[in-house]
Design a protein with these regions (language model features):
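A short gly/proline-enriched turn/hairpin at secondary-structure junctions
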Residues: 67, 73-83, 98
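Surface-exposed, charged secondary-structure patches
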Residues: 92-141
Length: 182
């Protein structure tokens, strides 16, 4: 019985039949289709992002939230989130009350256009600004910390940020400010 299976496998493995191409199948990416993600050269987007960082450093809540959509989803990598522009204003107004000063440096800006959602719609297609930066914060209790952060901001059709994801380790922030938070 085993020899029959081995012989059958050899015979099927040696099949030299040439498959005909009937032209019914096409390449998934034609010459006219767009790449899934494209780098975009958008100095207005970069300048607006820089202005947002400056407003935050100056504790200017109106300037910081000026480019947020009313229904913005603000998410941190640890799972916490805020929903709505007013919630972002309220949260950061409270944070500004415990921060002595904050400075951002070593910025990297990467504006991209996502022509398709990479995961079936769970992540929005469209214009995104990816940023990496160093943060130095001194709190009113005298404690100072330094860390790197990464933001991913999605822009809606009106040019406002409707998704704001921030990837940071919040543990050092919580430890440095826990005696200031009620």
């Amino acid at each position: 019985m085993i020899s029959v299976i081995v012989i059958a496998a050899v015979l099927f493995g040696c099949n030299n039949e040439v498959k005909k191409d009937d032209g019914a199948t096409t390449d998934t990416k034609s010459a006219t289709s767009k790449a899934p993600v494209e780098l975009i050269n958008d100095s207005n987007l970069i300048n607006a992002t820089k202005a947002t960082f400056t407003a935050f450093e100056n504790k200017d809540i109106e300037g910081y939230t000026a480019n947020l959509a009313d229904n913005v989803m603000f998410r941190w990598s640890g799972g916490d989130s805020l929903v709505g522009k007013q919630a972002v204003k309220d949260y950061y107004t409270g944070r500004f009350n415990i921060i002595d000063n904050i400075k951002y440096s070593n910025h990297i800006f990467l504006p991209i256009m996502s022509n398709v959602s990479p995961n079936g719609g769970a992540t929005a297609a469209g214009k995104w600004m990816l940023t990496w930066f160093q943060t130095n914060v001194k709190y009113k209790n005298g404690k100072a910390i330094q860390f790197w952060a990464h933001n991913a901001q999605h822009y809606n059709d009106a040019g406002k940020i409707d998704i704001f994801a921030q990837y940071i380790d919040r543990h050092p922030i919580i430890e440095a400010s826990k005696d200031l938070v009620k």
